[in-house]
Amino acid sequence: MKEILLEYGEAEKIKVVPLWSASDDFKPICKEQNPFVKEHHLENKFVVMYSGNIGYTHSVECLIEVAKNMQTDNDVKFLMIGEGKKKTDLVAQAEELNLRNITFLPLQDFNVLPYSLASADLGIITLDENVSRVSVPSKTFNLMAVGVPLLAISNNDTEMFRLISKYQNGRCISKSNVDDIVAYIRELKSDKMLKQKYCNNSLLASKD
């Protein structure tokens, strides 16, 4: 973001505040010891999670198409957690398509959040292109703190792309490239070494 602001102002007037995460509350939790996993029957599932605002500034619609294209991947489960203006339409689309591989849950209490985020095998972050050039969703840092690989649904000219490129803890894919998103999920599910690398790098990034 500083680089962008330098186009419009003087360096000595710009103060960078370091990235944050509630690291004391958010830590990796193995699935066998995670009550959220047990409560929602996520054992033996590869969990693709979006958790947060399901509103106008978050490009989550493509996840319905991704879930549709992965209906035969019986070990993949999509979780969409949160509330927002788009949620009703997304639930209706999923029901119309009879998608059994996607579950919508309400916003979780803060004391549940460390467990819900840690249940993910892949964390989705996304922002509308109008704001993503200079912003990163705050959930990004909590996902990294629990050691989750990331999928940023965004273009390359974004803070999310720069963050993932720096720490090598996931991929950044445009919302229009549904096939690429599907391929990435399948690759991460099957390649244990790649997944572990991204997990480790997310943890390292959260402590940087």
What are these regions (language model features)?
Residues 45, 180-183, 187, 194-208:
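A short, well-ordered alpha-helix in the C-terminal region of glycosyltransferases
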Residues 32, 86-89, 111-112, 159, ...:
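Short acidic active-site motifs
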Residues 75-82, 87-114:
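Nucleotide-activated donor-binding/catalytic signature segment of Leloir-type glycosyltransferases, i.e.
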Residues 1-31, 42-43, 104:
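Donor nucleotide-sugar binding/catalytic pocket of nucleotide-sugar-dependent glycosyltransferases
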Residues 21, 42-58, 64-67, 79, ...:
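Conserved donor-binding/catalytic core segment of Leloir-type glycosyltransferases
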Residues 58, 109-118, 123-144, 149-162:
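Nucleotide-sugar-dependent
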Residues 19, 50-55, 83, 106-107, ...:
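Conserved donor-binding loops in enzymes that form glycosidic bonds
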